[in-house]
């Protein structure tokens, strides 16, 4: 009996070795035909973290879980009209440029305001802009930019405005059932692999429509078919809530609106988190406002009555004065921002220390130059 078991084990081992050898040969052939990394064991990539780029909003970075938009993925931003969708996307453009990247904006709606984009921090001289004549042209331009591997972020505004060529050439009133959905489905199939390979972030802004005859459930839907919903790694629902009134002479005027950004789909972190931000008219998301609120909740900024203080030093009476103080002191803003990110696990402690050390060295070098009588150019 023991001999029989031993023989069976030897046969199993022999077949196992043969199968392993056959697998190794197959992997070598695949690598030869399709390049290194075409097939790999999942464990080889298990240690790799998802690469992200900040959204330009601290609250949204926290809600996204990973610390920003994942690179090499498709993002969909949708919501009602004038809810702040383009503003959220433009903050991503500004952030990409801030990190030294190249951004492109496919303006299918032909409605981009350069002055507003510049106010949000976008370098309009460096921004690549396309205003396509048809949906196919817009998606083809996006595809060529992504394939180049030189662009870090592509924004398409909006999916609803990507009109198929056949619809443009036809008459108003002609029926074109499913034409846009088929166009988007084909585009997603072509673009998804290239987006992942080049680590480009592709943001698609979308509008809302209502399904006719829906009695129960949510009647809202987004145009362009189901393909974008499936291919998107992150979907953001942007909704304006209440108006923000001004102070003093502007107390009767609306100077902005409180906005909720809900992460309705997230493939890289837990979904359904909500970011609450203030979008100020002509300025975009109030970064100082969200920092004061979040840091106060974490007790990084201490609040006593109407006064806000940091490390025992008062920074303002009332949130508006605290926001103004942080805006005037960018180094302090960055320091508090880093501490908040460490608290939420978006930044390693070592990264924070190293970033602070670099800032400290720069300050020390500047002080040394001044002591030595060296002139500092503006």
UniProtKB/Swiss-Prot annotation:
User: Which parts of the chain span the membrane according to its record?
Assistant: none
Alphabetic keyword roster: ATP-binding, Cytoplasm, DNA damage, DNA recombination, DNA repair, DNA-binding, Nucleotide-binding, SOS response
Residues reported to bind ATP: 79-86
GO CC: one term? cytosol
Entry keyword DNA damage: yes
Record-level GO BP terms: DNA recombination; DNA repair; SOS response
The UniProt similarity line reads: Belongs to the RecA family.
Q: HAMAP family of this UniProt entry?
A: RecA
Name the NCBIfam families on file. Answer: tigrfam_recA
Q: What does this protein do?
A: Can catalyze the hydrolysis of ATP in the presence of single-stranded DNA, the ATP-dependent uptake of single-stranded DNA by duplex DNA, and the ATP-dependent hybridization of homologous single-stranded DNAs. It interacts with LexA causing its activation and leading to its autocatalytic cleavage.
| Entry protein name | Protein RecA
The gene it comes from is: recA
